[in-house]
A protein has these predicted regions:
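Substrate-binding groove/exosite segments of carbohydrate-active enzymes
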Residues: 1-117, 126-129
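Extracytoplasmic/periplasmic, Sec-exported soluble proteins
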Residues: 76, 80, 100, 137-147
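Active-site neighborhood of glycoside hydrolase catalytic domains
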Residues: 138-166
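Active-site substrate-binding loop specific to GH73 endo-beta-N-acetylglucosaminidase modules
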Residues: 132
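Glycan-recognition and catalytic cores of secretory/periplasmic carbohydrate-active enzymes
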Residues: 122
Length: 166
């Protein structure tokens, strides 16, 4: 709990000893701790607004939010970018709060349109994938495509919650 608290500086950060950046995957991996151990709703609602501000016209977002312009492109990929789906879903599950879903809905649609342009034969062949384990041999295509599926699954849920066509 103390380590998590040490990583909150108006945004969820990756670690207390090095970068202290708002890495998006680190945040969505720790969302349950943030909501169960702390009353983190306002922090995450604010950070979801940062994600909206971070999105480029083509639909991509940075792997670090806020960003000074670094971390865009195919480098971070769907595993990191899924933050815009996973955190609003967690806020809804824990608090019944749908404001983040409503605010992010157009951002999510634009992002999914962006991913469609990167798709090759139904797969997304880019992104960091399973990068933590130094001997990892999992093809990034698998992890990125799995999160692509998750994004669409959550988007269908959000469309239903908001009374929209999926």
């Amino acid at each position: 709990m103390q380590a998590y608290r040490s990583n909150l500086h108006s945004i969820p950060t990756d670690c207390p000893q090095r970068e202290k950046n708002g890495w998006t995957a680190d945040a969505h991996i720790a969302i349950d701790l943030g909501l169960l151990g702390f009353d983190g709703i306002t922090l995450y609602e604010k950070w979801m607004n940062d994600i909206i501000d971070n999105q480029r016209e083509a639909g991509e977002i940075s792997g670090i939010i806020p960003s000074s312009g670094w971390g865009y492109g195919e480098w971070p990929g769907p595993v990191w970018d899924a933050v815009m789906f996973i955190i609003p879903n967690a806020l809804y599950d824990y608090y019944g709060e749908s404001r983040s879903i409503e605010r992010l809905y157009p951002t999510m649609l634009r992002y999914l349109d962006y991913l469609k342009t990167k798709e090759k034969d139904g797969y997304l062949p880019f992104g960091l994938g399973d990068w933590v384990y130094w001997k990892a041999t999992t093809n990034n295509e698998y992890t990125s495509t799995a999160y692509y599926y998750l994004d669409y699954k959550l988007m269908a849920r959000f469309a239903s919650l908001l009374g929209k066509d999926a």
